[in-house]
């Protein structure tokens, strides 16, 4: 199915899309966190960020004169054997006169601080925007209308037009910027450094543990209902539900890795964000009915457009390159997982031939062999490790919580 509607070519500039959703409150908060999500360096020891534009995140609630502040470096670590391990730095934005460097004037030199301002901003003024209380307000997604950071940095894509339930507080009850629930913000903060592809699989596992476990009968029903209504249950391969992958015709999406892992492949969850809903498919498609000997065939042609300035544009392109006509291939960065702990049970009579009647010498296990067995991971340990992968690996695709849409799961 191809995926809004196609339009003719034009030389006119691309339209500016005005995004809705939660906005930073107009009145300052008593918290101490940045209003915005972090910029994340792609490599260790990356230089401070440089910006194509002003470097000030979009916030339409502030006057132009107030559009100035600083980016502050935050060292990050992940746990590991023998202690913590450094991962690439994060940079957080604060308005002048707020945050950890509230005592500095705009432009004062200090290590780990990068000052930015919009054209026409009054950098001698100090902001009354305050900082964020994480218990009341969620992070606001970064948007740069005049150009973002250089290629050494990235940020997780969080859409701001996805409806979520709000948390009623005195500070936000009268504002249109009511924040998502505390549980939602806690989940984003605690997993902000995890690889999103791994987190996609973890969310499915967590949902099953919390009472939404799919029974064998339910999974079988999901996989064998009417073809156009099927969904892939956990533990099923793609071809078990939708048939073998092909090239150049229907059923051409998915490489061998995706076929084997099914819904556990985080790329599936990410791409579901681009798939039209049933209503969008029906009312936003070009519908072509055709009578055939076996019945009525309905063809739906729908086009989903991912803007080139979307922070995840390159990632979506990469997945399409891997998975469209991807049968017989695997991602280049798909490394084999560690083997599970070998089963040390002795063979039973039913599983092995009777031994010869001779005395066998006992093999003495070396200490090195014992150590290797101890270091082998159980399947549970492998799964936990996969959930703890951080975004400092150069080939890891990071999606942001937006890739894990509630409706798609």
Swiss-Prot record:
InterPro entries: N_prot_C_CoV, N_prot_N_CoV, NCAP_gCoV, Nucleocap_CoV, Nucleocapsid_C, Nucleocapsid_N. Residues 358-367 have a biased composition (Basic residues). Residues 29-160 are annotated as: RNA-binding. Residues 226-333 are annotated as: Dimerization. Residues 15-31, 164-179 have a biased composition (Low complexity). The modification Phosphoserine is found at residues 190, 379. PROSITE patterns: COV_N_CTD, COV_N_NTD. GO terms for cellular component: host cell endoplasmic reticulum-Golgi intermediate compartment; host cell Golgi apparatus; ribonucleoprotein complex; viral nucleocapsid. The modification Phosphothreonine is found at residue 378. Belongs to the gammacoronavirus nucleocapsid protein family. HAMAP family: GAMMA_CORONA_NCAP. This is Nucleoprotein.
